[in-house]
Regions:
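Conserved NAD(P)H cofactor-binding loop of Rossmann-fold oxidoreductase domains
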Residues: 61-70
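Catalytic loop of short-chain dehydrogenase/reductase
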Residues: 83, 93, 107-145, 154-157
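N-terminal Rossmann NAD(P)H-binding glycine-rich loop of SDR-like oxidoreductase domains
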Residues: 6-20
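C-terminal helical subdomain
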Residues: 152-154, 159-160, 167-203
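Substrate-binding pocket helix/loop in short-chain dehydrogenase/reductase
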Residues: 71-72, 79-81
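A hydrophobic alpha-helix adjacent to the NAD(P)-binding/active-site core of NAD(P)-dependent oxidoreductases
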Residues: 36, 83-84
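Rossmann-fold cofactor-recognition segment
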Residues: 30-45
Length: 203
């Protein structure tokens, strides 16, 4: 049974991913508060130590990251930097720390979002972070070809977050729990790398 670490396991997205993997994989649930591993995705040395405590594993799934939804006029550069760090740099930090511990042809799955491809008002920070992740994965896939696989799942607003975001994603078809589960399972099992699995488009 493959050993998969899911970071962000206690969040809205992470809980659905964990539920979809637990039957067929040994899932280790990680977040700032656990339950299996406590992890600070911004601290490379800390992340490396946590992964070392697990030993070799077969896959990393990152379900972390958020950005501020403000108009460009409202965004400070500090807001922008924080959003990029939280959504993009934290996930790349996890990926970099995981590589020495991954089994041969192991998988890394990061999470971006539809705003990397399709605009919404007040979404400039999300667009920058998601777009950067999407482009970075193709480069990393080339660098690590034959050694490991790295992909991204890019959902729309997920069904269990529609009420939270309200009209911000008006007209976008929510991504279902089933679609989320299939996508993350595919990145773990299928012989693909450098792919952005875009789950839905705006209506």
């Amino acid at each position: 049974m493959k050993k998969i670490i899911v970071v962000g396991a206690t969040g809205k997205l992470g809980r659905e991913v964990v539920e979809g993997l637990e039957k067929d994989y040994e899932v280790i649930k990680a977040s700032r508060s656990g339950p299996d591993l406590k992890i600070d995705a911004f601290d490379f040395e800390s992340v490396s130590d946590v992964f070392a405590s697990v030993g070799p594993f077969d896959g990393l799934v990152s379900c972390i990251g958020s950005t501020p939804f403000k108009t460009f006029d409202e965004l400070s550069m500090e807001d922008f930097a924080t959003g990029l760090s939280t959504k993009c740099f934290s996930q790349l930090n996890l990926a970099k720390a995981a590589i020495p511990f991954l089994s041969e042809n192991g998988s890394i799955t990061l999470t971006s979002g539809i705003i990397g491809d399709e605009p919404i008002l007040a979404g400039s920070c999300a667009a920058a972070a998601n777009g950067a992740l999407n482009m970075c994965v193709s480069t990393l896939a080339a660098e690590y070809a034959g050694k490991l696989r790295i992909n991204i799942v890019s959902p729309s607003i997920i069904e269990n977050s529609v009420d939270y975001y309200g009209m911000l994603f008006d007209g976008f078809e929510p991504t279902s729990k089933e679609s989320i589960i299939y996508a993350y399972r595919r990145t773990i099992s299928a012989p693909i790398s450098g792919q952005v699995l875009r789950l839905t488009r705006s209506s």
